[in-house]
Amino acid sequence: MSGGAGIPDVPAFDASDVRLAIVASTWHTKICDALLAGARNTAADSGIDNPTVVRVLGAIEIPVVAQELTRNHDAVVALGVVIRGETPHFDYVCDAVTQGLTRVSLDSSTPVANGVLTTNSEEQALNRAGLPTSDEDKGAQATAAALTTALTLRELRAEA
């Protein structure tokens, strides 16, 4: 995965023995489907052809499903999009999802990568969704983060 402005270059790595799960919401379908495609591509490039994929309605449902997935997976990727509207709902959802995913990761000692886009506009989300016209692919980036963290944790635990 090639880096752009501030985005690290992630070298190719073999994660073929990592049990990967992806939970993706369905609001803003075009964006979420693109994030999921990027995640699947990165998984395949890393040797994982069939990650577990679970779809949920909205972003707020992602943490509890991620929590369940940590029970039998080595890494979880959370994908979705929350676009700012005219009410404080955006702030509540973004905070709840971010805190929920962080708590799940720490409580389970399992990497849970946060690929939930929190943007001010649909245009910003589309630009990060991994579409042909996008500048970034947050689905791919989150998957690389989850997998490399799982491999790092495996190494650290083997040394202990």
Curated annotation (Swiss-Prot):
This is 6,7-dimethyl-8-ribityllumazine synthase. The gene is ribH. GO terms for molecular function: 6,7-dimethyl-8-ribityllumazine synthase activity. The lineage of its organism: Bacteria, Bacillati, Actinomycetota, Actinomycetes, Mycobacteriales. NCBIfam families: lumazine-synth (TIGR00114). Pathway: Cofactor biosynthesis; riboflavin biosynthesis; riboflavin from 2-hydroxy-3-oxobutyl phosphate and 5-amino-6-(D-ribitylamino)uracil: step 1/2. Keywords: Riboflavin biosynthesis, Transferase. Gene3D superfamilies: Lumazine/riboflavin synthase (3.40.50.960). Belongs to the DMRL synthase family. The active site is at residue 89. One of its GO terms (cellular component) is riboflavin synthase complex. SUPFAM superfamilies: Lumazine synthase.
